[in-house]
């Protein structure tokens, strides 16, 4: 009775599993089961059928499968009676030597007679042989069985996914059945053939050669190229690296880290070329947008069977500012005019600039802070003091973003003196505070305490200034504790070593840590007199924004920051007198 039920089953074209007739849907170009229709959706079934048809055609091996017997018929009661004693067990391996002339029978030996001829494809795994042989009892005509041979062609690639040594051992363990392999098959044969491997290796070699040439041009600042090309490449290279992702699948993220210009033969015009690492940290480098877009398009599998209809720029998005969640279409940054160097890239579309690590350090794992999460988080205002231990390990958002891009051992890593680590910054500031206010090492910090509003602190605070510091989340009362407050913003102020800190408005030199720092723009620093005059000019009503006159947005949002009432009262208080360096 089980054989009768098996003969009524039909095979789904997509999942390739036996289904009862009532579970099949015949409304499409191929018979599919209701499970596949419900899982994939009726609107996508035809696309998947086309993709499956192309895959099965492209994976059919040259040897193919012999059509075998001319026809199959349903088992009769006489056949069932003759095979009743054999239906519960598989025949021994020697049964393969029987001739395959029993076309009208569905008995057990028929499962193995397909492997007797050298022109037929034999599967090394007994489980796969059983799966293939059991399909002969589905009652299909030989015309449909030919299509079934192509339909099941994907099974031939399954053993190739195993290590070659394991596959060779499995084949040798079959004894006499190992001789039934087709002449063109080899246990150690690669999945896509030697031609595919050679083509892949050649592509990688060409891409690395182009990348080497691009890095050499970057080191020489593209000497000998036209001025427009040179300036464009320098501007774009200053913005690298930055993230790119696939528009239809945001989980596919790569990283653009280099640019170059290639000459086009017709008019000897130059065309922009960018180099992308995808996925991030994999070390796989793609030259050009089309190559990485094709790979992302293939990995997304949203619309299999289709090809890219454009150059790939409309399928990719780039991150305008790292960690902000602001993604724009790559075609807005690299327009046709920009790619042909006829016009400069729009300044408002350029990605946020970060230190550019070497390509070797680009793919390394990001460094870890001792006990802090390095993911950029939006700043939030705090009205209560924090313990000094937590303050010492705090990093600003700018510092987090910089450390995200720099890998250990790179030219901008935390171990090098170019960009000091938070511990080194703390030591430098402590030494500066201990020697002289004019020491260049003391000019690299600000008093931003992690909140969204400006703050000010001093190394030797009077009691009136203790309230100001506590209001902004830092409860230091000694020069050492004050250095901890400065270390949190050492990398976020953007000040270069040796450059004096000056007020953005009056250009007067600022005391080491006595100034108002804009939390959004590192270059916005204001002295207390200018901040006081700005607050008074705004009047008592309304919000008081950045003293520069701009409404600087908070990191990760479009909402501008504003002074808190406690901060306004502290800045306007008359008992705070900031001592300038020029004062005696």
Swiss-Prot record:
Residues 82-100, 449-458 have a biased composition (Low complexity). It is an enzyme of class 2 (transferase). The modification Omega-N-methylarginine is found at residue 177. One of its GO terms (molecular function) is zinc ion binding. It is found in: Nucleus. The modification Phosphoserine is found at residues 66, 125, 186, 371, 384, 421, 436, 453, 457. Residues 59-120, 346-421, 433-495 are annotated as: Disordered. GO terms for biological process: negative regulation of transcription by RNA polymerase II; protein polyubiquitination. Its main location: nucleus. Its EC number is 2.3.2.27. Pfam families: IRF-2BP1_2, IRF-2BP1_2_M, zf-C3HC4_IRF-2BP1_2. A zinc finger (RING-type) spans 503-550. GO terms for cellular component: nucleoplasm; nucleus. Residues 354-369 have a biased composition (Pro residues). Keywords: Coiled coil, Isopeptide bond, Metal-binding, Methylation, Nucleus, Phosphoprotein, Repressor, Transcription, Transcription regulation, Transferase, Ubl conjugation, Ubl conjugation pathway, Zinc, Zinc-finger. There is a cross-link at residues 227, 438 (Glycyl lysine isopeptide (Lys-Gly) (interchain with G-Cter in SUMO2)). InterPro entries: I2BP1/2_C3HC4-RING_sf (IPR044882), Interferon_reg_fac2-bd1_2_Znf (IPR022750). It catalyses: S-ubiquitinyl-[E2 ubiquitin-conjugating enzyme]-L-cysteine + [acceptor protein]-L-lysine = [E2 ubiquitin-conjugating enzyme]-L-cysteine + N(6)-ubiquitinyl-[acceptor protein]-L-lysine. Belongs to the IRF2BP family. Interacts with IRF2. Part of a corepressor complex containing IRF2 and IRF2BP2. Interacts with JDP2. Acts as a transcriptional corepressor in a IRF2-dependent manner; this repression is not mediated by histone deacetylase activities. May act as an E3 ligase towards JDP2, enhancing its polyubiquitination. Represses ATF2-dependent transcriptional activation. This is Interferon regulatory factor 2-binding protein 1. It comes from Mus musculus. The lineage of its organism: Eukaryota, Metazoa, Chordata, Craniata, Vertebrata.
